[in-house]
């Protein structure tokens, strides 16, 4: 049996741009992509912490170190610059690998600079805005 599991996520990134007239996708700073092991053209799920919207799109590599998080095309209607989003990637694994795999959790600051990369995730205390 194969399971779809969390591979990685970029946690609470700040949307820097939205471009309705572009063909689609999310542009992500190359440095963030590497830290989260996300490839160009990979499908990701985006969760908007400000309005609850959840949607899927694919990734375009943005300039390294720029902090860019830009939603393009129709997805631009679901975010505003300044919104906080979680960008999630998944992987299909067999049950054995799924039991031991530890996803990368990329924590960023308000300018989308990497603060910490964690391996795995745990439930945080009520009211916490980051995971322990």
UniProtKB/Swiss-Prot annotation:
Localization, UniProt: Cytoplasm
PANTHER family: ASPARTATE 1-DECARBOXYLASE
InterPro entries assigned: Asp_de-COase-like_dom_sf, Asp_decarbox
Cofactor(s) needed: pyruvate
Manner of cofactor binding, per the entry note: Binds 1 pyruvoyl group covalently per subunit.
GO biological process, one term: pantothenate biosynthetic process
Catalytic residues (UniProt): 25, 58
Cellular component GO terms, alphabetical: cytosol
Top-level EC class: lyase
Similarity field: Belongs to the PanD family.
Pyruvic acid (Ser): residues carrying this PTM: 25
Record pathway: Cofactor biosynthesis; (R)-pantothenate biosynthesis; beta-alanine from L-aspartate: step 1/1
Name the record gives this protein: Aspartate 1-decarboxylase
HAMAP family per the UniProt record, alphabetical: PanD
EC number(s) reported in the record: 4.1.1.11
Keywords: Autocatalytic cleavage, Cytoplasm, Decarboxylase, Lyase, Pantothenate biosynthesis, Pyruvate, Schiff base, Zymogen
Residues where substrate binds: 57, 73-75
PTM description: Is synthesized initially as an inactive proenzyme, which is activated by self-cleavage at a specific serine bond to produce a beta-subunit with a hydroxyl group at its C-terminus and an alpha-subunit with a pyruvoyl group at its N-terminus.
Entry-linked Pfam families: Asp_decarbox
Single annotated GO MF: aspartate 1-decarboxylase activity
Subunit structure of this chain's protein: Heterooctamer of four alpha and four beta subunits.
Function according to Swiss-Prot or TrEMBL: Catalyzes the pyruvoyl-dependent decarboxylation of aspartate to produce beta-alanine.
